[in-house]
């Protein structure tokens, strides 16, 4: 009986991980729509306030699917664009964190897409 419960727990855990990855992988189109909406926002104040939440959501998708090149590309673009647009002049420390994260996402995506690039 204990083995049965262990098997059930393992299967439930595995299905949760698989479905999280599937959801993340299917979010690329939605992230593109959100990115378009973000860059088209007429209120810079609203865009600045919404940006961190959008990027945290993208970070969460990358936790579920860390080798998704499309999501890594969006992460690189969004983090660097946010840093340049909203942080460079006002908060250099935060800007540097965002640039570093964006660069990390970009380099990881490139190394996955072009395996010999890092050598």
Role assignments for model-derived ranges:
Residues 29-60, 64-67, 78-119:
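Short coil/linker segments at helix-helix boundaries
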Residues 13-38:
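Bacterial Sec signal peptide processing site at the extreme N-terminus
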């Amino acid at each position: 009986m204990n083995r049965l419960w262990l098997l059930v727990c393992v299967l439930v855990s595995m299905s949760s991980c698989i479905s999280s990855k599937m959801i993340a992988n299917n979010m690329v189109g939605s992230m593109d729509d959100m990115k378009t909406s973000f860059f088209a926002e007429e209120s810079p104040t609203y865009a600045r306030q919404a940006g961190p939440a959008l990027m945290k959501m993208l970070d969460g998708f990358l936790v579920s699917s860390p080798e998704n090149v499309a999501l890594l590309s969006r992460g690189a673009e969004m983090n660097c664009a946010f840093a340049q647009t909203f942080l460079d002049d006002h908060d250099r420390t935060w800007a540097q964190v965002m640039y570093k994260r964006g660069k990390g996402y970009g380099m990881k995506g490139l190394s996955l897409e072009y395996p010999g690039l890092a050598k």
